[in-house]
Curated annotation (Swiss-Prot):
It comes from Azotobacter vinelandii (strain DJ / ATCC BAA-1303). The UvrABC repair system catalyzes the recognition and processing of DNA lesions. UvrC both incises the 5' and 3' sides of the lesion. The N-terminal half is responsible for the 3' incision and the C-terminal half is responsible for the 5' incision. GO terms for molecular function: DNA binding; excinuclease ABC activity. The lineage of its organism: Bacteria, Pseudomonadati, Pseudomonadota, Gammaproteobacteria, Pseudomonadales. Residues 203-238 form the UVR domain. GO terms for biological process: nucleotide-excision repair; SOS response. It is found in: Cytoplasm. Belongs to the UvrC family. Disulfide bonds: none annotated. InterPro entries: GIY-YIG_endonuc, GIY-YIG_endonuc_sf, GIY-YIG_UvrC_Cho, Hlx-hairpin-Hlx_DNA-bd_motif, RuvA_2-like, UVR_dom, UVR_dom_sf, UvrABC_protein_C. Keywords: Cytoplasm, DNA damage, DNA excision, DNA repair, Excision nuclease, SOS response. PANTHER family: UVRABC SYSTEM PROTEIN C, UVRC/OXIDOREDUCTASE. This is UvrABC system protein C.
Length: 607
């Protein structure tokens, strides 16, 4: 214990700014990622001499190093925190379900553009603003923008088939351009105001609205003045969620990350205020190298040693170094142009800086992934269960439904090399009482292990079921009836608070009940597999439920197959709008004749 982390010494030099902190153990393994409005104040709570919760005390006992990243505000800290948790899955963090990508605000092209949420590749014509730290934050921003400027958010298929204003117009969230209740010039002004805000020009926008408010007051239009006052207040509330766009000038953003075993420098190129792209570099450095040392070496080799390479007028870095003044002087003389290297930045540049840090963290994590944390967890599980050797194959089952609707069971498979996604299976559960998880589990296990009799499938070493004694008893019964050779049964029951780290485990006949420490690698493996089974089950359930709810009277119409049905619903914006359409309106849809339109109309109005 002589090498215990010196919290007091660390806090003496810790920033009081907002940011993200990362706690690592003596092996350099990430234990916990957190965010704070005041880093020093938040971190001081971990190093009190008394009053720590047991789980917190266990965490602090393992800390060998704490790393911090200063951010411009709490929103930026949240973005970075989520990125790191997503990539590292630290054992002391609550592991939220992973989103595949951060959402963007999308503004479409056209005479009456729409605002919406976008994920994935940017293939649609229009403008993108973001990324945002969460779907919740982007929905809040869109809701406030909708309230302030009333730009439509409906899909184009819905928009072009309206014959009267929708509910959004009635509650003053849309000016109903679909039915001509707003002039194109007025709508364009609302779009322009929305873009100003999304570009980060909220101060200029607020000044413009303030001037309009004063003019309204002078003309005694107090109702309009009050509306403008409320718009300004709304804008101030969401200034922290502005997009990456809206910067100016040419900038290279460099973020270096150094960890045991390697380093990464992530470069983001910004030209004319727009992010053009990014790239990772992995210099060979020693473990003792500091971030500033890595950055100084990179600047010299990347720019100074390559005079033909484009050099912007500004370089943003995530650490400082004593060699920077000399590098600036040398590059200025070499390129005959002014150069600034900045460490402390704000607003959009701070956003670029934090995103570069997050990307460097992710890239380095992938670079060092062959250390195979998962293999070590399998070893720990073997020790916890007193096995002679680590298991080679683990399967986990979970059930998902909505009040008994569209029940789906999942089976995920893991080996020492990780998830074996090619062997995942889903089972649509039929013929059981709605909401009966035991019957659903019985059916899924029977279908899975019944295949073994036919020589199909592999026998797992460990079968995990998400549930307590009841689910474990069902699994035992099924395996007994099918004469499945001996395998280890492990039930995972959440604690009373349903928080990770408080699970109760049941082994085989459920007589052996035990728990594992919250920092146990064996427990982390069990949680990881269970959470993956839950994710796989719930995505399957949602897909099945959505398909069932989309079925309609259209299925009874000859000549309207699945493809044409999808195209019809897309064209009209949903079944409800299609049902309201006349025969002539239906016939305007691509591929629909007058005769077929008559049949569709009759089917939809047969009652």
């Amino acid at each position: 214990m002589g090498n215990a982390f010196d919290g007091a010494a660390f806090l003496a030099h810790c920033s009081s700014h907002p940011g993200v902190y990362r706690m690592l153990d003596a092996k350099g393994e990430l234990l916990y990622v957190g965010k704070a409005k005041n880093l020093r104040k938040r971190l001081s709570s971990y190093f009190r001499t008394s009053g720590l919760a047991p789980k917190t005390a266990a965490l602090v006992a393992r800390i060998a190093q704490v790393e911090t990243t200063i951010t411009a505000n709490e929103t930026e800290a949240l973005l970075l925190e989520q990125t790191l948790i997503k990539e590292w899955r630290p054992p002391y963090n609550i592991l939220l379900r992973d989103d595949k990508s951060y959402p963007y605000v999308f503004l479409s092209d056209g005479a009456f553009p729409r605002l919406g949420i976008h994920r994935g590749a940017k293939q649609r014509k229009g403008r993108y603003f973001g990324p945002y730290p969460s779907a919740g934050s982007i929905r809040e921003s869109l809701g406030l923008l909708q309230k302030a400027f009333q730009v439509r958010q409906c899909e184009d298929s819905y928009f072009r088939n309206r014959t009267r204003p929708c509910l959004q117009h009635q509650i003053r969230r849309c000016k109903a351009p679909c039915v001509g209740l707003v002039e194109p010039a007025e709508y364009a002004e609302d779009v322009r105001h929305s873009v100003m805000f999304l570009e980060g020009r909220s101060n200029a926008l607020a000044e413009e609205l303030s001037a309009a408010m004063e003019r309204a007051a002078v003309h005694l239009d107090f109702e309009r003045a009050a509306e403008l006052r409320d718009q300004i207040a709304l804008l101030r509330r969401v200034q922290d969620q502005q997009s990456m766009e809206g910067g100016s000038g040419d900038v290279d953003v460099l973020a270096a990350v150094v960890k045991p075993g390697g380093a990464c420098v992530h470069l983001i190129s910004v030209r004319g205020g727009r992010v053009l792209g990014s790239k990772n570099f992995f210099p060979q450095v020693g473990i003792e190298e500091e971030v500033g040392d890595v950055l100084a070496a990179f600047l010299g080799q990347y720019y100074l040693a390559n005079p033909e390479r484009d050099l912007p007028g500004e370089i943003i870095v995530n650490a400082t170094h004593e060699d920077f003044p000399a590098l600036v002087l040398a590059l200025t003389e070499q390129r005959s142009r002014e150069l600034h290297i900045r460490h402390r930045v704000r607003a959009t540049r701070a956003r670029w800086q934090q995103l570069a840090i997050a990307n460097a963290e992710q890239a380095l994590s992938a670079r060092l992934a062959h250390r195979q944390h998962l293999a070590a967890r399998f070893e720990a599980l073997a020790e916890a269960l007193d096995l002679d050797a680590p298991p080679l194959r683990m399967e986990c089952f979970d059930i998902s439904h909505s009040s008994g609707e569209a029940t789906v069971a999942s089976c995920v498979v893991f080996g020492p090399e990780g998830a074996l996604k090619g062997e995942y299976r889903r089972y649509n559960i039929e013929g059981v009482t709605a909401g009966d998880d035991y019957a659903a589990m019985q059916q899924a296990l029977t279908r899975r292990f019944g295949k073994l009799r036919e020589g199909e499938g592999k026998l797992p070493d460990i079968l995990l079921v998400d549930g307590g004694k009841g689910q474990l008893a069902i699994a035992q019964e099924v395996l007994r009836e099918l004469a499945v050779p001996d395998l280890i049964l492990l039930g995972v029951a959440k604690g009373v608070t349903r928080k990770p780290g408080l699970e109760t485990l049941y082994l085989n006949d459920a007589v052996h009940e035990f728990t594992l420490p919250a920092d146990s690698p064996a427990l982390h493996l069990i949680q990881q597999i269970r959470d993956e089974a839950h994710r796989f089950a719930i995505t399957g359930h949602r897909a099945r439920r959505g398909k069932a709810r989309r079925t309609s009277s259209l299925e009874e119409v000859a000549g309207v197959g699945p493809k044409r049905r999808r195209e019809l619903l897309k064209f009209f914006g949903g079944l409800q709008e299609l049902s309201r359409a006349s025969i002539d309106e239906i016939a305007k849809a691509p591929g629909i004749s007058k005769k077929l339109a008559d049949s569709i109309y009759a089917a939809l109005h047969s009652e």
